């Protein structure tokens, strides 16, 4: 209960004003500050104490109050009592406890204490009158107040006030003047509130003063509504009017005003201008004149510069193409998508560490160091973060945060190069891909070296140009800038050049060794390479697409392109309008080069470019190859109707009419046929439609369209089979009508979700793999096991059951410890596997464990994904694999025995006659005596003239005959000094002879 005031504090708060009035009395009337030295002062003290005692009698105090522990702590000293109290000895010689009522220490100012009981006589008087104060409290209080008022007036009248000296001077004070006494009585909190109110009041006055310059939105809307109500009418009014007609054939009557009304409005505007001028001060006219001169000088300078530029260009370079003339020179001049520009520039800046020696910090590293929003660890993993710049908490999205799909890998290798060392720009022609590569490369500080891959298609020339552009000897040019290689039309390069580029990027190219014995070093790529192509899905670009940073070039916005064309037309003084340029951009497919060339053609003919010319002429149109996604988009989406300008070619004089585009079924069918025919790859288009048609929004809730679409898929498959297998190209034109049927079944106004078809390729790879496995299985079947079937019978009837047949239940023990039943099952499994040519091979699984699988893999032929079936443990497979190898060796060994003598003799003679080549040995040729002593033989020869002569050969001695027989032997032996490690077999001389 210490926080609540007691009776004494309530008294002080109730009569605070009167007590402060007593404090302001002169010194001769203040008898409470200390003991008096004169009797007159003592008498005055008694007289002044009486009204105070009367005031204190009016409080409602009881006996409990006087005997409370708070009052028992009050002590009185000589300094606090008057002279009579000291004489009577009513004081106990102490001081008032100032902590009890919060009285500050130090000499008393005014009243000696904040308590109402600072004099002992007052307490005694209250004790004597406590019984009567309850019944006569109101009369006592009124009497005490009257006495206090008389004393106060008597004391105040003795002082001369300002009003007595100067009269009424309240009008001299400013509105901000405040009585010092009142100002002193306020607390600090009240002063703060008053300062806030003062600031708000000044702001309100400032807003009211600025209302003459600007009204709020509600006031302006109200004023506009009142103006229309006074000056516009849908009915015939009473005031003068002018009738006009809207586009919906409704008439509106506009009011005519007199000249006096116009003059009054002008005067009102000028009066408002004077208010504005008063804010600017006396120098308003001078400031306004200087501002006008600055604006006029800038406009004149710009017009003069444009006229000078146009005239100089027209005179100096009359035959220069506008495409080269207005080619972007700086980054801000690019018309392409900003995200595309920033992505390519970010990839180029990742080469700064290798090329320029500057440290490059990726976005992830910066967020890890500084953190998003100023936090030390980054706020990517937090739900909320505090942003020091704004001083607010910001939501990071948490688990709902959309993760951006970045095709760029921001990681770097050991040398500080990006992981994707080549950028691949792809998009339709004419959008500015080459211009973008040149501009961003120069902006990043490189010297652009362009190589057109379709100029010289030989791999040697491509290799030489690529090496010269990236070698350190020719890296720096006159401007001391490193080279950036730009390979334009990379899709026109041969496959060998693309393969060499991939090896060059992967640091797999080695330099030629000049010195003998030197070690070849691989070439390290230290310069960025930018490749440009039209079709990123070209088969030749498949190896490059896997290692490159692919940047898809989106089409340029038609409105943004038209704004740039307006500037060019203004500089070249070509008369045209914004609508005509937008129509030209849309008709050309937002092709920048085509639009600028068309404008230059009309300017050369001294003819203005109008909307009629754009619609009637074949401007900006060219035979472009439609991409696969563009064709699929045309199949699954209905084009929204747009406003067009319809003209009749036969009636040129009649004005054109604005109509909506035709969205009838006939027009849609014609558009689909044109788009599909421009692509030509019907098989790939069919696969894309087949894999994406179920992902689209079905306009048919009964799914009858799905059944109809499947019939068209069967029809298309049949036609393609006739073309590919039987070479029947007479049915080729019917392939495109299936896309028309699918368009009419599944096309909607919504944007389709299309994914590139990959299931056909995956199924083809799986089919090829399974076909190879089955062929290996058929080759391994021995002749004794041909009864199990061949072809489809083996695949359907035998293979599904082999997994269960080849899975015996064996214990994990040695072969000698197996039971007879287990040994019989093991022997049967081994015989079946040897007859079918199967075995277990140890391979490494995707998890990193080694397992035994059948070779050929029967699981790929018979097991479904996710169904393991019956399987053997690792130990059993290892045991069976070992026994199968031993059985194959045992069967391959020749069978031996001890046959009988006649049979052995016959067998030996037969074996000698049919001995295999690898077992036969060379035997010496016998020289018989008959040959040595044979009779001479006649030999027929021809002489020089061609006549036939007979020559007799006589026999020589036995030694000569023996030597001649040896010389005529087909095998010679010659000793050669040295040895050869390739000969590993010991050969004796008798084996050769």
UniProtKB/Swiss-Prot annotation:
Gene3D superfamilies for the chain: 1.10.8.60, P-loop containing nucleotide triphosphate hydrolases
Residue sites binding ATP per the record: 427-434
GO molecular function: ATP binding; ATP hydrolysis activity; DNA binding
Bias-annotated ranges (Low complexity): 894-913
UniProt xrefs under InterPro entries: AAA+_ATPase, ATPase_AAA_core, CTF18-RFC_complex, P-loop_NTPase, RFC_lid
GO cellular component, as recorded: Ctf18 RFC-like complex; nucleus
Pfam families: AAA
Biased composition (Polar residues): 60-72
Compartment annotation: Nucleus
Biological process terms in GO annotation: DNA replication
SMART domains: AAA
Keyword Chaperone attached: no
Keyword Nucleotide-binding: yes
Keywords, ordered alphabetically: ATP-binding, Cell cycle, DNA replication, DNA-binding, Nucleotide-binding, Nucleus
Region ranges (Disordered): 26-72, 892-913
Disruption phenotype: Viable. In ovaries, results in defective oogenesis leading to sterility. Results in morphological defects in both eye and wing. Simultaneous knockout of cutlet and RfC4 or RfC38 exacerbates the eye defect of the single cutlet knockout.
Coarse class of the protein's main subcellular location: nucleus
Family membership noted in the UniProt record: Belongs to the activator 1 small subunits family. CTF18 subfamily.
Function: Chromosome cohesion factor involved in sister chromatid cohesion and fidelity of chromosome transmission. Component of one of the cell nuclear antigen loader complexes, CTF18-replication factor C (CTF18-RFC). The CTF18-RFC complex catalyzes the ATP-dependent loading of PCNA onto primed and gapped DNA and has weak ATPase activity. The CTF18-RFC complex catalyzes the ATP-dependent loading of PCNA onto primed and gapped DNA.
Known partners and oligomeric status: Component of the CTF18-RFC complex.
Record protein name field: Chromosome transmission fidelity protein 18 homolog
Source species: Drosophila melanogaster (Fruit fly)
């Amino acid at each position: 209960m210490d926080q609540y005031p007691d009776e004494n504090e309530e008294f002080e708060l109730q009569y605070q004003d009167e007590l402060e009035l007593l404090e302001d009395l002169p010194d001769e009337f203040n008898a409470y500050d200390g003991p008096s030295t004169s009797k007159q002062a003592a008498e005055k003290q008694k007289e002044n104490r009486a009204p105070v005692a009367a005031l204190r009698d009016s409080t409602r105090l009881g006996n409990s109050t006087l005997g409370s522990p708070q009052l028992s702590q009050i002590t009185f000293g000589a300094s606090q009592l008057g002279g009579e109290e000291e004489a009577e000895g009513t004081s106990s010689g102490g001081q008032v406890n100032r902590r009890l009522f919060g009285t500050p220490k130090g000499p008393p100012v005014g009243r000696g204490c904040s308590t109402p009981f600072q004099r002992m006589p007052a307490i005694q008087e209250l004790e004597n009158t406590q019984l009567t104060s309850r019944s006569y409290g109101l009369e006592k209080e009124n009497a005490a107040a009257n006495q206090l008022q008389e004393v106060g007036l008597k004391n105040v009248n003795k002082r001369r006030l300002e009003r007595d000296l100067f009269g009424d001077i309240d009008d001299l004070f400013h509105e901000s003047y405040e009585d010092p006494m009142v100002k002193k009585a306020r607390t600090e909190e009240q002063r703060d509130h008053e300062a806030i109110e003062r600031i708000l009041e000044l702001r309100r006055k400032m807003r009211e003063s600025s209302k003459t310059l600007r009204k709020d939105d509600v006031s302006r809307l109200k004023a506009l509504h009142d103006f229309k109500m006074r000056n516009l009418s849908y009915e015939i009014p009473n005031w003068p009017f002018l009738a006009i007609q809207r586009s919906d054939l409704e008439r509106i009557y506009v009011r005519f005003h007199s000249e006096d009304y116009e003059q009054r409005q002008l005067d009102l505007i000028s009066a408002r201008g004077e208010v504005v001028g008063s804010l600017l001060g006396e120098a308003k006219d001078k400031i306004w004149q200087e501002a006008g001169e600055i604006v006029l000088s800038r406009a004149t300078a710009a017009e003069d510069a444009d006229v000078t530029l146009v005239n100089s260009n027209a005179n100096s370079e009359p035959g220069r193409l506008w495409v080269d003339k207005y080619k972007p020179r700086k980054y801000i001049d690019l018309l392409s998508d900003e995200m595309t520009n920033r992505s390519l520039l970010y990839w180029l800046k990742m080469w700064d560490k290798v090329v320029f020696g500057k440290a490059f910090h990726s976005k992830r590293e910066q967020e890890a160091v500084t953190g998003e929003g100023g936090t030390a660890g980054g706020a990517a993993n937090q739900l909320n973060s505090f942003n020091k710049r704004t001083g607010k908490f910001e939501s990071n999205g948490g688990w709902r945060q959309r993760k951006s799909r970045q095709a760029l890998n921001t990681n770097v290798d050991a040398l500080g190069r990006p992981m994707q060392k080549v950028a691949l720009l792809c998009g339709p022609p004419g959008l500015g891909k080459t211009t973008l590569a040149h501009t961003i490369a120069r902006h990043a500080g490189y010297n652009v070296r362009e190589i057109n891959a379709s100029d010289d298609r030989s791999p040697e020339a491509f290799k030489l140009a690529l090496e010269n552009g990236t070698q350190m000897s020719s890296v720096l040019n006159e401007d001391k800038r490193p080279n950036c290689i730009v390979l334009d039309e990379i899709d026109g390069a041969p496959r060998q050049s693309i393969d060499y580029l991939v090896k060059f990027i992967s640091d797999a190219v080695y330099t030629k060794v000049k010195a003998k014995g030197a070690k070849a070093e691989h070439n390290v790529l230290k310069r960025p390479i930018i490749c440009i192509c039209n079709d990123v899905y070209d088969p030749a670009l498949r190896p490059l697409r896997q290692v490159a940073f692919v940047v898809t070039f989106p089409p340029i916005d038609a409105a943004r392109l038209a704004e740039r064309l307006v500037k060019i037309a203004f500089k070249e003084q070509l008369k045209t309008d914004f609508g005509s340029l937008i129509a030209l951009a849309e008709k050309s497919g937002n092709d920048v080069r085509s639009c600028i060339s068309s404008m230059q053609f009309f300017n050369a003919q001294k003819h203005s470019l109008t909307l009629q010319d754009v619609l009637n002429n074949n401007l900006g149109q060219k035979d472009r190859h439609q991409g696969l996604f563009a064709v699929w988009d045309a199949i699954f989406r209905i084009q929204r109707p747009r406003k067009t300008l319809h003209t009749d070619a036969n009636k040129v004089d009649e004005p054109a009419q604005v109509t909506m585009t035709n969205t009838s079924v006939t027009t849609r069918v014609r558009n689909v046929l044109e788009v599909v025919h421009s692509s030509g790859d019907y098989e790939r288009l069919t696969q894309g439609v087949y894999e994406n048609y179920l992902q689209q929004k079905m306009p048919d809730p009964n799914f009858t369209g799905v059944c109809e679409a499947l019939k068209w898929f069967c029809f298309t498959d049949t036609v393609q089979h006739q073309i590919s297998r039987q070479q029947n190209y007479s049915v080729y034109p019917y392939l495109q009508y299936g896309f028309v049927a699918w368009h009419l079944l599944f096309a909607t106004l919504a944007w389709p979700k299309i994914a590139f078809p990959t299931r056909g390729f995956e199924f083809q790879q799986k089919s090829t793999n399974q076909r190879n496995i089955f062929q290996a299985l058929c080759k391994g079947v021995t002749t004794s096991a041909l009864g199990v079937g061949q072809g489809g019978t083996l695949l359907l009837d035998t293979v599904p059951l082999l997994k269960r047949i080849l899975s015996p239940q064996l214990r994990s023990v040695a072969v000698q410890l197996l039971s007879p039943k287990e040994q019989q099952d093991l022997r049967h499994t081994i015989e079946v596997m040897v007859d079918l040519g199967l075995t277990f091979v140890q391979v490494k699984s995707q998890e990193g464990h080694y397992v035994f699988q059948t070779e050929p893999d029967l699981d790929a032929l018979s097991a479904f994904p996710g169904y393991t079936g019956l399987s053997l443990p690792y130990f059993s497979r290892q045991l069976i694999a070992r026994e199968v190898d031993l059985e194959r060796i045992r069967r391959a060994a020749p069978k031996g025995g001890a046959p009988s003598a006649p049979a052995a003799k016959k067998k030996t003679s037969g074996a000698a006659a049919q001995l295999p080549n690898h077992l036969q040995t060379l035997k010496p040729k016998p020289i018989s005596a008959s040959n040595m002593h044979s009779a001479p033989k006649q030999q027929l020869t021809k002489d020089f003239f061609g006549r036939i002569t007979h020559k007799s050969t006589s026999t020589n001695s036995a030694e000569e005959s023996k030597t001649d027989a040896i010389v005529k032997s087909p095998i010679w032996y010659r000793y050669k000094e040295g040895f050869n490690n390739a000969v590993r077999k010991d050969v004796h001389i008798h084996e050769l002879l």
